[in-house]
Amino acid sequence: AEIAYRKSYDTALKKYPEKARLIKENLDRLSDLEKAENTNIDEISNTFGNLMAEVFSYKDDEYAQSLKNVGFNIGKYIYILDAFADLDDDIKNKSYNPFISYKDDREALKMRVDKLISMILSRLEMNILSLDLNLNRTIIENILYSGVYLRYKGILIGVEDKKNM
C-alpha cells in the first residue's frame, strides 16, 4: 500500500507542484499552531480550511473560487467538529485541543460551536448553490442537508448526553 501511495503522491507532486507547496505550507502552519497549543479556533480552523481549499480547487477554471470556498468551509467544519468531539479524550490523554479552555463550561462551548458550525454551513450552502451542479445536485444536497447537518447535530447532542451520564 505504501508503494502505491508513494507513486500517487509523486505523480500528484509533479502534476500540481504549486498545490503541493501550498498544502505542505498549511500543514506545517497547522502543526506549528498545534505545537504552540494555540486556542484561537478561527486561526487554526482557517489554516485547515486553507489546506482543504487547495485540495478542492485542483484546476484553474470558472469554478475554482467556488470550489476553494467549498473546500475552505468543509475544512473549517471538519476541524471544529473534530476538536469539539475529541475534547473529553484530549483532556483525559493530556493532548492538545483548541477548546481546552472550555473544559469546565461545556454549555458555553456547545453554544460557540453551534454558532460557528451554523455560519460555516450557511456559507457552504451558498458556495455549493453557486456551482452548476445539474447532474448531481440532489445527491450533493442530501449529503449537505442530511449527512453533514445531522452529523453535527448528533455530535452536539451526543456530547451533551455523555456529559449527563
Predicted regions and their residues:
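Acidic catalytic motifs of isoprenoid enzymes
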Residues: 1-48, 54-69, 76, 80-118, ...
